[in-house]
UniProtKB/Swiss-Prot annotation:
Coiled coil: none
Identification of the protein by name: HTH-type transcriptional regulator MurR
Keyword vocabulary terms for this entry: Carbohydrate metabolism, DNA-binding, Repressor, Transcription, Transcription regulation
Subunit structure, as described in the record: Homotetramer.
GO biological process: carbohydrate derivative metabolic process; N-acetylmuramic acid catabolic process; negative regulation of DNA-templated transcription; regulation of carbohydrate catabolic process
Lineage: Bacteria, Pseudomonadati, Pseudomonadota, Gammaproteobacteria, Enterobacterales
Length: 266
């Protein structure tokens, strides 16, 4: 379930007590084998029920399930670190050889793919495929690296017969958004979900009655709140200088899966 990733990406939604619990779990994950919910509640000055509710909010049945899962994740992470310490212990530096850089990049992309697939909602994807398959027109929006992902998806969709607009110019994106109609679909790609231009386009699309599908991170964001559907991507973007590469890898895996699903649906 990758609960450590869930905790990191849901931080902006935590209450004060939930943040205390999250900080404790991350700082003391190596000691969780000997920690009970009662001990934890006493140490943090909160109720046991708050800890149970926190675990359930993350998708676990209770604290015991969350604790055991975190212990397992920590152990697996330690094993990977010991086996591949050369390319996962730090970001790329100016002293790295090309071989080391290649290993770091590959590992980063592997982690982005593993985490994205592990947290993916495939039932939601099926609903999205059904919505897109009926759309008379599709607009794809994105900036920077996300725009490249959008352009790639637009070419794929056009090849199988969909009417698609994917413009790099933000003014054109805004104009197209304002011309969408009910039944049309806008696919907004933004890892942060907070790019002003993309959010404005999503607002315009919703106002026109179009369905907004966001390909974004798990973190709460204006785009995530605006979207009718979300396709979640995960990458260690705050930990690596090459973060946009892992983000793009995660986004491409989602758009490729969406494309293949649409091909099957035809």
């Amino acid at each position: 379930m990758l609960y450590l990733t869930k905790i990191r990406n849901a931080e902006s939604e935590f209450t004060g007590n939930e943040q205390k619990i999250a900080d404790f779990l991350r700082a003391r994950v190596s000691e969780l084998k000997s920690v009970s919910s009662r001990q934890m509640a006493k140490q943090l000055g909160i109720s046991q029920s708050s800890i149970v509710k926190f675990a359930q909010k993350l998708g676990a049945q209770g604290f015991t399930e969350l604790r055991m899962a975190l212990i397992g994740e920590y152990s697996a992470s330690r094993e990977k670190t010991n086996a591949t310490a050369l390319h996962v212990h730090s970001s790329i530096t100016s002293d790295d050889s090309l071989e080391v850089i290649a290993r770091k990049l590959n590992r980063e992309k592997e982690m982005a793919l593993e985490q994205t697939c592990a947290l993916f909602d495939y039932a939601r994807l099926q609903k999205i495929i059904e919505v897109i398959s009926k759309a008379p027109f599709i607009q794809i929006t994105g900036l920077g690296g996300s725009a490249l992902v959008g352009r790639d998806l637009s070419f794929k969709l056009m090849k199988i017969g969909y009417r698609v607009a994917c413009e790099a110019d933000t003014h054109v994106q805004a104009t197209v958004s304002q011309a969408l109609k009910k039944g049309d679909v806008q696919i907004a790609i933004s890892y942060s979900g907070s790019k002003k231009e993309i959010v404005l386009c999503a607002e315009a699309a919703r106002k026109q009655g179009a369905t907004v599908i966001a390909i974004t991170s798990l973190a709460d964001s204006p785009l995530r709140r605006l979207a009718h559907f979300t396709l979640d991507t995960v990458s260690g973007e705050t930990e690596w200088r090459s973060s946009s590469m892992s983000t793009r890898t995660a986004q491409n895996s989602v758009t490729d899966l969406l494309f293949v699903g649409l091909v099957q649906h035809q």
